[in-house]
């Protein structure tokens, strides 16, 4: 088992590394040339800056039983299709039971944004310690489940 992080602007990299160290699970950070990262624990793979290049690279190297961390529903859907586990940086698990609805909501929201002529889209709220704790608990629970499923 490995953990793969769609690491462009991902706020939970250090949390993932700390928890993964406890379980001796290798971590791979994937980023494009606009977001070069370094890590003492994780392998870092830098991909060209093309649209979705990081996403496609991540999916090409993840396998059944791996854990994928991404805020991209499309990446999560492809990871689930390969038998990997997938989690959002909020701690919400992507599952085969919820991914179709999430993709449909994303599509409808994108359609609504296109038709509304609004140019400004409000960004996410500032991340809190509670957000980090929620993610850490959810991620650790996912690791335990993934380890059990390997047995």
Task: For the regions a language model picked out, list residue spans one by one.
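Nuclease catalytic cores that cleave nucleic-acid phosphodiester bonds
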Residues: 2-151
